[in-house]
Structures are given as C-alpha cells and as structure tokens.
Amino acid sequence: MGGLKFHVLMYPWFATGHMTPFLFLANKLAEKGHTVTFLIPKKALKQLENLNLFPHNIVFRSVTVPHVDGLPVGTETVSEIPVTSADLLMSAMDLTRDQVEGVVRAVEPDLIFFDFAHWIPEVARDFGLKTVKYVVVSASTIASMLVPGGELGVPPPGYPSSKVLLRKQDAYTMKNLESTNTINVGPNLLERVTTSLMNSDVIAIRTAREIEGNFCDYIEKHCRKKVLLTGPVFPEPDKTRELEERWVKWLSGYEPDSVVFCALGSQVILEKDQFQELCLGMELTGSPFLVAVKPPRGSSTIQEALPEGFEERVKGRGVVWGEWVQQPLLLSHPSVGCFVSHCGFGSMWESLLSDCQIVLVPQLGDQVLNTRLLSDELKVSVEVAREETGWFSKESLFDAINSVMKRDSEIGNLVKKNHTKWRETLTSPGLVTGYVDNFIESLQDLVSGTNHVSK
C-alpha cells in the first residue's frame, strides 16, 4: 500500500492481553512500511520481542515503572499481582507520564495509540499530535460501560442487544474486580475507559463488523466520534514453532476430536474448592483431558491442591498443568475436540478460528459479555450454568461438555454448524487484509491533518 508513511507511538496497559494485541497490530502497520515505537515495562520485553516480526520498523523502548505503596517492590505487569491490585499498577502507570513525554519529544511520532493511560490525549495536544484509543476488549464490553448504573439484565435505551448483558447472577464477576486497597489511587477503571474514549481523537476497536457491528455503531453514536475497526488482527502463524514434544506425544495416543482442553487465562486464580470442582467435572466426562490453570489460592503447586485420589483415578487420561501452554497450537491439534475457556477476548478469537466445540466458564465481567456474545447471540458455544455466587458444580461443567461432545446432541450439532459458518466468514480471503488496509487509510487521513509542535 502506498501513500503517506507515518510513525506511531504505542503505550498499552501492562497486561499480556493488552500488550500482545497492540503488537499484533504493530506488525500489520510495520508490514506496510510504517514505523512503530512500542513503549513497555522492561519485564515485558522478553515476553514480547519474539513476537516482533519487523524489528527494523518496530522499536521497543522501556519505561521504568515507579513503586507504589501496596504493590510488591519491582512490580511491572499485571501477571505479577492479583487482579484486585490492578488499580495500584494503573496508578504506577500514571507516574510514568514524564517518561512518556520524554519519548514523544525524542522520537516525534505522528500518532499515539493508548488504552488505560487516560492522560495521553493531554500529552498529545501539547505536541500537536492525534491520539487513538485502541480497544482490545470486545465492543460489547465497551458499549455496556457507556451507560453504567442501570439494572442488571435490563438493556439501557438504545443498547443494541437484549442478550449480551450482565444479569443479576453475574454480580460475582464485578466483585472479582473490586479493589482490596484502602489507598486512594486515582481514577477507577470505568473512569479511565470513559475518559479515554471521550478525549481521544478517534476510537479503534479490535473487532469485525460482521461480529459486533451493532455495538460499534452504538459506541460511535454515544461518543460522537469516528470508530475505526482493525478487524480481528490475528497473529501470523509461526511456522518455525511447533507444539512441545510432551504434548505431541501425549495427544497422539487419542482419537481425533476426543480430548477436552481447558484453559482459563493468565489472570484467573480459582479458590481451592472451585479448582477441585473443576477437576472433578473433567473427570466425570470420561474423556481424556488437559487442564491448564494456575495453582489455586493458598496453594503453591497444582499437585498439593488436587482432590484426594484424583491423580490415581485419571492416570493415563487426565493432566492438570500449572504452567503456560501453547494454546493456539493445542487448539489446532486434531485430537483436541472441545475447548473449555474463560472467554477472554484473545481466547474468544482463537476459539472461533478453531475446529473445537466451545464451552465457556467466564470469571470476570468482560468475559461474561464475550460469553453471551458467543453463546446467546452467535450461538456457537455453551455456557456452564452457575449459582448466583459464581460457583459452578462438577455436574454443571460435565453437562455443558457432554452437551457438545455427545454424538447426535441437538445443541452440539447446532453450535457446531454455527461455529463453522462464523469460522469460514472470519477466514474468508481478503477479510483481515481488507480491514487493515482500510484502517491504515483512515490513519493516513488523520495524520495528514496533523500539525506537529516542537517542544
């Protein structure tokens, strides 16, 4: 693609689920000849540098994350702390403003992409730059945040769906996010998001109109500014990396589509009793299974938290793993037939691209909305039933898995048919590149009207 070449400064929130989608987009921009300066904490550099496909066009710069009372000394990323302490890390991010201004002065970008650093538009204005609020959660999540305080389960006026909502029984997902800190740490998450949306020059969302067009229109109307879509921005398949030999060997012992794979993301830490119930539910399926979760609260290892006698009973067909796994490669293995997921936004796209049946057990508010989008709106998955406390039983987990894995299951056939349709849509030739090309053209138009100010 020809036209104006521009330089973007990206400053994502210090969470893997934010930094990696920013970098996926950076790769798409760099592929077209644009330059990206990517600002992240030092600890995140090792994790991300191997995902940089264009190191000549994408340059990492590190920020020093100041210490904030209440956080362990040296904390730089969300993965190091409980989710309830994220507000403290956001406060630490706010303290990097001087460093960001120094980088802007040094590299002279044309645009700044950001998400939770709500003060970026103020910085950009001082330098005569335009800003892009890049949303890497679902459009439905953002749409639901624009009119807070309503009754759970009741769509506010103009909201585009009666299905993609938090219901009364989902109140537990909000409690999971409530801060346990007594220190005044500035704006809360909702305030950061809404301020960023209102003060940015444009809003960009990592989604496709085919999936969330009605929510994107709602956001554009409510915020009274242009909403650009990048498309799903899938990472390029890394043909040089293969699935770890331990999993290749283990999976090769099972029939196609027979293994149940469960992964709940890097943020989710279950209570011990819920962790054990998860394990027992997987055992009930009678299927071979792999569960990849962090050790539960109060346990330093997976093994010490397993139900009594569990390892012996599932020996040879069940594995519970407490470390990172190659989720996309596992989902593409022919033996894996069902994916039990928390439905984080990244995992949502990975599940849609897979051939697996999808069972969802969300833990946080945005994951619930993603789940409703897939289960109730698109009808490509099944949600695990749970109580108002958020508790799900081994029986409800078994029922959900069985409903999609059982031969001749009516619901299993329905979600498989719908899933196939949406997967074919998302992988249709030209869809992703079309979104990226249109997005870049919109950025070129934005930059061409920018007047830089030297400082």
UniProtKB/Swiss-Prot annotation:
Binding residues annotated for UDP-alpha-D-glucose, in chain numbering: 266, 325-327, 342-350, 364-367
Family annotation (InterPro entries): UDP-glycosyltransf_plant (IPR050481), UDP_glucos_trans (IPR002213), UDP_glycos_trans_CS (IPR035595)
Pfam families: UDPGT
Keyword Nucleotide-binding set for record: no
PROSITE patterns, per database record: UDPGT
EC numbers on record: 2.4.1.-
A single MF term (Gene Ontology): UDP-glucosyltransferase activity
Chain segments annotated as transmembrane: none
GO biological process entries: anthocyanin-containing compound metabolic process
Keyword Transferase: yes
Keywords from the UniProt entry: Glycosyltransferase, Transferase
PANTHER family: ANTHOCYANIDIN 3-O-GLUCOSIDE 2'''-O-XYLOSYLTRANSFERASE-RELATED, GLYCOSYLTRANSFERASE
Family: Belongs to the UDP-glycosyltransferase family.
The protein, known as: UDP-glycosyltransferase 79B2
Organism, scientific name: Arabidopsis thaliana (Mouse-ear cress)
